[in-house]
Amino acid sequence: MVKFTKQFEGQLVPEWKDAFVDYSQLKKDLKKIHLFTNGVEKKHTETSLIKTVKSSLGRLSIFGNKGREQSRVIQVHKKLASSGSNNDVYETELLEKIADDTDAAKEFFACLDMQLNKVNQFYKTKEKEFLERGECLKKQMDILIELKDAFKQKQANGESTQESKEDDSISCTISCEYDSVRGRTEEMQLQVSCLDNLEDNGEEALESLGSEEPIKANNEDSKLTTVSSRVFSCQGKNVKIKIPLTNPSRTFSAISYLINQSSSKKNGPDGGNKLQISKKKLSHAEKMIKGALTELFKGLNYLKTYRNLNILAFMNILKKFDKVTGKQILPIYLKVVESSYFNISDKVMILSDEVEEWFIKHLAGENRRKAMKYLKPHHRKESHSVTFFIGLFTGCFVALLAGYIIVAHLTGMYRQHSANTFYMETAYPVLSMFGLLFLHLFLYGCNIFMWRKARINYSFIFELGSKNELKYRDVFLICTASMSAIAGVMFVHLSLLEKGYSFRQVQVIPGLLLLGFLLILICPLNIFYKSSRYRLISVIRNIVFSPLYKVVMLDFFMADQLCSQVPMLRNLEYIACYYITGSYATQDYEYCMRVKYYRDLAYAVSFLPYYWRAMQCARRWFDEGETSHLVNLGKYVSAMLAAGTKVAYEKERSLGWLCLVVAMSSVATIYQLYWDFVKDWGLLQHNSNNPWLRNQLMLRQKSIYYFSMVLNLVLRLAWLQTVLHSSFEHVDYRVTGLFLAALEVIRRGQWNFYRLENEHLNNAGKFRAVKTVPLPFREVDEED
């Protein structure tokens, strides 16, 4: 049977962990009473039969109220909070001696009261937040329905021409200017700062958070604005529509709108007062409302879970207390818990039913099953067959890799000054590229395993849906199956060369292997994790076209991964040139190295990941206005300069370039180490409870964090190989390069865990368990 502690910790909302009943602390307080009681029993071994009979008779209901009053050893008082808010505070008074250690009993009930007050206040705060969100979404639905009715009425009256049938729209009058991104960001930050106080001030912060009015930031002085929001008058209401600039088409349309608006002002006051609201815009607005309703429904379910688990926690700890002390406290205190606000309030249940009804009626076409796919998505069940195939493919990969290594050793392919240079220049880059790629993917699977074990909500951080979320077993299956295929193909390729086949006859095999993986990646059939593959393609697209796309956590996390895969990208570029130019047919592997534009492209590939990441920082600064993004941009600029000096030094090995490599690489390394430890991992806090770490740690062993910092430092210094020209004896320099590239991939895999741990703790500190989806419409006064 699973212990309640594990069951409780396994089912609670990770980001709200500090707001749940501190069950472990209550168990510690109860253990003090238990240890003291056991010590007294050893000194006084005699037992009283009369007391035992009386206590047993007192429990029987036949003795009525008299028996109940005798068992009433505590009284729970309900008071108003001293801060003057409407929050109730519970305080327990001991009417008689409960345990041999009275102080320990008082300490236990003080902690129990504190937990009950905390749960009540947090529930009220979140309930108020969700109710306000629900009221806002109800207005959004009304506006959306009204605009949809306007379209239907227009079509019914036959007003639309042949042109408008292609893109039906209604004309609305613009009544004011556009909104400010930074102003909205400041408002959000001020609201978040109130939540930050909760971690520092405990109950008082919860009280102030519950009683505080919404804070509005003054955005009049903000210079950075966006045309994503426009105000129009439709059906007797002034409504502001805000469509986020999340992709290039919206960004360019917003810029063209600004140009048209400025030209219309020159032509006259009435030149630009009409705004066409198309079906496309309404469709996007409907998507935004659908996403907001889904997140609200998820938050309401979290609040239900919060209530149920806390009730169980109170019940279990009171049962344990009764068992230790022999008293009947459970029925008395549990009655207070059941009558407290967080248990008797039904507002969350009512709102949850309303959200479900709205979704079914207006967004799912009265189809309940379709609505439930959005509101309650089913997660894929983990199959034992996946585990079986992981083991099968692992065995195949090990056997094929062993065979490949033996054949390579016998032929001397990887030795320095080998006669088989052609193989190392053409086939080996394919193997090393796939090796680095799937090593990275394997480490990502290890990351997922550790995140789940540490209760880090990575799917929420990455905004992964149930369809495109890969479990760690899925990742391991992809890795083992792919590497088995790669090792098998490369083993066959090398064996054919050993049997006397010419390079011309077998050289197409590595190219076909690469082509096969590319076809699987873009395959439109619903096989091989289609949703995850297409999500990966969309993320790569967002990175490549930075800063035109709005940057989310998954985008810049993936861009950071590419910064550690520069050798893989250079191999990919060389392989593409080798096969696209037809060099494999002429066996002229040096062609791609002789051509100037290829050499220039090789330099560009070394810069690209850092450039993409820098552009993402610029876009985040543009959207949010935080200077920390500009400082982060400087880190990637320093990395680009360091990479550029390394490439130049490889081309022209002079003392001047060597000094420049050392200087630039040292600056970039120090910059990156500081950002890794302080910003990305949140460590090196000198006033922390854990020396030079941070106050909250997801791993119990502090030594792991110190070891990880040292290991990250050592692996960051891999660039020294460029200066020292170190290599393994009798081993080709390309193998040495692969080994060093693999070390950087391992460093990135280690970095990933602590980066998401810090992000999760930031979410937990702000009790952020659901996304805040922007809403498309906002009513404004005519004066505005």
UniProtKB/Swiss-Prot annotation:
Tissue: Expressed in vascular cylinder of roots, leaves, stems, petals, sepals and filaments. Expressed in receptacle, stigma apex and anther connective tissue.
Protein name: Phosphate transporter PHO1 homolog 1
Extracellular side: 409-429, 496-507, 676-703
Keyword entries, A-Z: Cell membrane, Membrane, Phosphate transport, Transmembrane, Transmembrane helix, Transport
Reported induction: By Pi deficiency in roots and shoots. Induced by sucrose, auxin and cytokinin. Down-regulated by abscisic acid (ABA).
Membrane topology of the entry: Multi-pass membrane protein
Compartments, record wording: Cell membrane
Changes seen on gene knockout: No visible phenotype.
